[in-house]
């Protein structure tokens, strides 16, 4: 009986793990969808992406090395219907550095044209959500 139970546990986990990962993948698909119109405007969308899950009012910092002279866009999405998310870009001194910000339901974005080359921080926040935790994904690009 114990052996049978031990064999069933990995099978049960194997069926749950892909489902859990699929939601982050859904958020990534939505983030790429948000970035698509900007690719038509000449942005090169990077393959780099970040994701995870956050509770309401929780934040996650994502670091990116940005270069003076380029214009960058960051696009954030969640797969949670009814969730409101935001992304804001800060410089290494902690000052808000974005030149544009938008938010529409499960999507958000920010643009920045850095004054200097260096580390910048995209702060992802779940402002509200019908769920305890919401999956999110962030992509970025430049032109």
Segments (PLM) and residue ranges:
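Hydrophobic beta-strand segments within beta-rich accessory/binding domains
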Residues: 61-79, 121-124
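Extracellular beta-rich ligand/substrate-recognition surface
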Residues: 48-58, 103
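Extended, low-complexity, turn-rich repeat/linker tracts enriched in Gly/Pro/Ser/Thr and Asp/Glu
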Residues: 78-85, 129-131
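Bacterial N-terminal signal peptides
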Residues: 8-18
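Short, surface-exposed beta-strand/strand-loop-strand elements in extracellular ectodomains
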Residues: 81-96
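Positively charged n-region of N-terminal signal peptides that target proteins for export
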Residues: 1-5
